[in-house]
Design a protein with these regions (language model features):
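Short, non-transmembrane alpha-helical segments in secretory-pathway proteins
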Residues: 2-16, 67-107, 151-187
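A short, surface-exposed interaction/processing loop segment used at functional sites
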Residues: 53-69, 138-160
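Exposed beta-strand-loop-beta-strand "reactive/processing" segments of non-cytosolic proteins
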Residues: 8-47, 95-138, 144-147, 177-198
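Preferential activation on post-signal-peptide N-terminal prodomains/segments
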Residues: 1-79, 83, 87
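Generic hydrophobic/packing signal
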Residues: 73-77, 122, 139
Length: 198
């Protein structure tokens, strides 16, 4: 993640901080921790961005809670998460973009999960690319795993769709192509999606 310059200022601003926010370094300077009275933002040189706010208040609010519908609240939460993701990806100078993957709701809590996309193809790693947890309008936690990719120039054959579909069992309904981690590289692969009802 960005550690200096306007990319850092934009990222700090997305989380409600300024360039003058108190910070300290951890892990031999590879992690910069920004903090105020209600929240903490950790920026790791590896690209890991972690935000957490206390239960009582929040630095980042998606909307004014006075008079809003559930649908409008979700739209505002998505907009808030997207603004933060855009700032993080600019700060990290990545060549990827984010795509909403899942929305989980439980009472007042909403969790938004995003996939990382490279050239329009999902990149599947060991953990979700980005997760945002809102408690009503307040952003409680956010985790973003920024990565840069460099094409190797190699080619890899992915099983043709018709051949893959012919081999599908009844429970396997959809086909998806994605980059998956393999031997320290991300390689394209095709796999089946199962119906959630089965």
């Amino acid at each position: 993640a960005a550690q200096s310059g306007t990319g850092l200022e934009d990222l700090l601003g997305a989380f409600g901080y300024t360039a003058y926010t108190d910070f300290y370094n951890e892990q031999d300077g590879t992690v910069r921790v920004f903090l105020d009275d209600t929240s903490t933002l950790r920026l790791n040189a590896s690209g890991l961005v972690q935000y957490a706010s206390t239960d009582g208040s929040a630095t980042v609010s998606a909307y004014d809670e006075s008079d809003i519908t559930d649908a409008a609240a979700l739209d505002a939460q998505l907009d808030c998460a997207r603004l933060i993701l855009d700032a993080a990806q600019r700060a990290g100078d990545t060549d990827t973009h984010a795509s909403l993957y899942a929305v989980e709701r439980s009472g007042e809590q909403t969790t938004l999960i995003f996939l990382q996309m490279y050239s329009g193809v999902p990149v599947l790693g060991d953990a979700d690319f980005a997760t945002f947890v809102f408690d009503g309008s307040a952003l409680r936690t956010a985790t973003i795993r920024l990565q840069k990719f460099q094409p190797t120039g190699g080619k890899r054959t992915v099983m043709p769709a018709k051949q893959a579909a012919a081999g599908a069992s009844g429970a396997e309904r959809g086909l998806m192509a994605a980059y998956r981690a393999q031997d320290g590289q991300y390689v394209p692969s095709r796999f089946y999606l199962k119906n959630a009802a089965e």
